[in-house]
Amino acid sequence: MSLSGGRSSDRPIILERIRSAILATYIVFTHESTQDQQELDLYQDKVGATIAGHPLKVLAAYGPQEALEGDGPEGVVIVEFPSADAARAWYDSPAYQAIVQHRVKGGRFRAVLVEGV
């Protein structure tokens, strides 16, 4: 279906799909606390292999930080993807899902997908 044709009720869905496919999207991981360093070490050893074939760029990883409001996390990782679809493809990939258990067992984290503007 073309963007100029079809039912007008389809247009918001089509436009949202286009928007999702072209806007930079970020996954922000905040490491709130550590429960099991060995599990986190396993995750760290394996996460690099999950990147192959995925268009992503690590923008920040456990660098210096300053909490402007509230308590600061132990660490922050910000990963950029070319689209929300690309971000979900990596996060939902069998390779990443096979290791995410180590991060979850190793500490308290937040993972947030944020679309750019």
Protein language model regions, located:
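C-terminal structural segments of small proteins and small subunits
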Residues: 88-112
